């Protein structure tokens, strides 16, 4: 029997959607779930170290959120335009979402920051997506840092005092339109402790696209088409993960983006881990056969989202909905700035 969208719905009291990050990253709460027994324990994120064994590997996504939202003016008409950068296709060409899209025809020019940066629409695609080419003097990322703002998820209504709180402490590779949020709980000190305990820290890159927030519209979830995202796992990382595996250690993923990268590679190479890069549209849902990941850290996800489906593929649907109900009863904080789960 195929599952429907309603099977992944749950009632979340509005006040449990975290609007701001907690003061200390690793003081967020942690719901530990044993997927074999269904047993749950309420902890704090800094307790995660007790769950990790020497010889395990913790995998993290080092993608950095770009200040991808730009506000500009069309010199021809004086009309305003909002441009959200999705990803860099080549050179100075970008795939973007534009508002208002219907007025952004091919050839339209938009100026940002008094002309420090201009863009020309080069192609129109479906879903309001526009290809644009930028023109500027200097270094693009520096100009973007000065003119752009970080796009926060639509359910966060409050302004962020410190934009760094929507970046992981190890964010390095520019390219995401949203943060890989499970990683927001790690601090440099906690990662050092993890390393000191004999656990390997492994970094990969997956640039999170806006499809992350796109609702599933098909009742039959098998009909849902995932968005594509760019990923990369380098040679050193693959080598470390293979050594950990050979020595009986666990591969513990931080967040759904790390999971999707590792499972994409495992699916491509018959369960093996090899260095690889490319685009993935993997849709992990109940019935999926896991290839690489042994345990993972993840936040609490939106009702009916593909991310809830991914977690349900690991635990079973009933178990995850029960865990979410427990989290609601215990007043855990949900979504991007919320608390975390450790599922093993």
Curated annotation (Swiss-Prot):
Pathway: tRNA modification; tRNA-queuosine biosynthesis. GO terms for cellular component: cytoplasm. Signal peptide: none annotated. It is found in: Cytoplasm. It comes from the Bacteria. Its main location: cytoplasm. Keywords: Cytoplasm, Queuosine biosynthesis, S-adenosyl-L-methionine, Transferase. It is an enzyme of class 2 (transferase). Monomer. HAMAP family: QueA. This is S-adenosylmethionine:tRNA ribosyltransferase-isomerase. It comes from Lactiplantibacillus plantarum (strain ATCC BAA-793 / NCIMB 8826 / WCFS1) (Lactobacillus plantarum). The gene is queA.
